[in-house]
């Protein structure tokens, strides 16, 4: 069980040890810093330190190989994220040059390409908002459903969002995918 220090300096040192282990991709050191639980790689991290799920933190801060290590150890790529950034959407939201490779890795480890996140968007909705045709192509090839609508606000599909935004490259990919579905 991880003991959270009461004093700010102690919490800062603990956070730094955790953050450094994530950024370096040190699996054993990270497990120890997080208290040594047998399944630390799939348990929410301490709220007091402003941390969420280990896989989400790794998506933002760790080497891609470490993300694979966490997934291979059993970290759930479909973790719940009440802030709206489940794994695929978290990966798409980064400015990492390898973000599409991370999305591919997540999907290869059974991440749901139709997961819901911020604004009830699917990863396709998020890729449209980012104007990322390559992400749309990857998601469609991985089984993402282009007919899904958000269940709030305008209840729109990713295609409707692309049309509204004037994102023709994305709209074209989505139209083509919808026409293949029949």
Regions found by a protein language model. Name each.
Residues 20-25, 57-63, 90-99, 126-132, ...:
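Ankyrin repeat A-helix N-terminal signature
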Residues 31, 68, 100, 104, ...:
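Conserved positions within tetratricopeptide repeat
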Residues 1-14, 19-37, 52:
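Extended repeat-based scaffolds of very large eukaryotic assembly and lipid-transport proteins
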Residues 118-148, 159:
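A generic hydrophobic-segment detector
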Residues 84-85, 93-106:
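Eukaryotic tandem repeat interaction scaffolds
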Residues 2-18, 142, 156, 160-182:
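Ankyrin-repeat-protein effector appendages
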């Amino acid at each position: 069980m991880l003991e959270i220090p009461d004093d700010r300096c102690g919490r800062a040192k603990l956070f730094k040890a955790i953050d450094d282990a994530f950024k370096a991709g040190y699996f054993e050191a990270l497990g120890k810093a997080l208290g040594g639980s047998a399944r630390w790689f799939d348990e929410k991290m301490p709220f007091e330190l402003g941390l969420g799920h280990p896989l989400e933190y790794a998506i933002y801060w760790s080497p891609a190989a470490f993300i694979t290590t966490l997934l291979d150890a059993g970290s759930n790529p479909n973790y719940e994220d009440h802030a709206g950034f489940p794994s695929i959407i978290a990966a798409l939201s980064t400015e990492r040059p390898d973000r599409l490779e991370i999305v591919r890795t997540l999907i290869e480890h059974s991440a749901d390409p139709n997961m819901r996140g911020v604004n009830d968007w699917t990863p396709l909705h998020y890729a449209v908002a980012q104007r990322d045709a390559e992400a749309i192509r990857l998601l469609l090839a991985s089984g993402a459903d282009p007919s899904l609508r958000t269940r709030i606000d305008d209840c729109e599909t990713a295609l409707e969002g692309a049309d509204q935004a004037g994102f023709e490259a994305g709209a074209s990919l989505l139209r083509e995918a919808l026409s293949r579905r029949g």
